[in-house]
């Protein structure tokens, strides 16, 4: 049972929401299917990159080394949308929202270890350098996740827990989500390409690691900023969540 994961108890209220995230991943049909699809696709990418020359050019190397990590953040694009089903309960105590945001960040940061491990065959095969994968993983956990989590401020459409997302709920047609997702995917690639051209590969990967670590180490600061901005819009968002159920 999820409640038996006592390892999370040491994190207090944030730990309880970590349990909730894990429970949601296992029981929520939409989140579970997204996760399974992501795992299968990452394995396919790893095999193709390791044993074929299909993605041997410079752009493909950068794109396909980043994509497995951004793929893990697909559920973050709809951050707070599943919670729209019971958002009024969370708002009974405002601190719940901050703890929930922290739990989401920690949970999705930890899950980045999965694509990192699955992509290790590309390192063994000599397709990608280990430093590149480390840079992409840490950069994703840093500025990329910071960008995606800011969607919690404006997301106000409830995502059904067990019905298909093709249902006309407005979740799938949120153009802000699409734009942010595209920026989160292609901005790091553009940044790596430009830096690589000027300072070389290894300094570029080290730069990504340093920037990523800076965001990771300051996560409580920018999560608190997101929380405060959410509280300013809580009634508007609450109305949106309740009307879209």
What are the language-model segments listed below?
Residues 1-84, 97-245:
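Hydrophobic alpha-helical transmembrane segments of membrane proteins
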Residues 87:
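A glycine- and small/hydrophobic-rich beta-loop-beta segment
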């Amino acid at each position: 049972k999820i409640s038996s994961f006592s390892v999370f108890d040491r994190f207090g209220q944030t730990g309880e929401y970590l349990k909730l995230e894990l429970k949601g991943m296992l029981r929520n049909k939409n989140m579970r299917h997204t996760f399974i699809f992501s795992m299968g696709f990452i394995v396919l990418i790893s095999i193709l990159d390791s044993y074929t020359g299909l993605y041997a050019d410079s752009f493909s190397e950068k794109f396909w080394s980043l994509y497995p990590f951004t793929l893990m953040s697909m559920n973050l694009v709809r951050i707070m949308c599943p919670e729209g089903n019971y958002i009024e309960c969370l708002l009974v105590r405002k601190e719940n929202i901050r703890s929930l945001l922290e739990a989401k960040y920690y949970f999705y940061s930890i899950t980045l270890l999965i694509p990192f491990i699955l992509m290790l065959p590309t390192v063994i095969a000599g397709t990608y350098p280990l430093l590149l994968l480390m840079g992409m993983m840490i950069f994703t956990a840093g500025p990329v996740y910071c960008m995606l989590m800011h969607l919690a401020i404006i997301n106000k459409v409830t995502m059904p827990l067990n019905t298909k997302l093709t249902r006309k709920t407005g979740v799938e047609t949120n153009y802000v989500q699409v734009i942010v997702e595209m920026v989160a995917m292609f901005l790091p690639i553009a940044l790596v390409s430009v830096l690589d051209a000027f300072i070389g590969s290894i300094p570029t990967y080290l730069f990504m690691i340093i920037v990523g670590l800076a965001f990771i180490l300051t996560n409580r600061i920018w999560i608190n900023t997101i929380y405060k901005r959410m509280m300013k819009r809580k009634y508007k968002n609450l109305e949106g969540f309740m009307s879209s159920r």
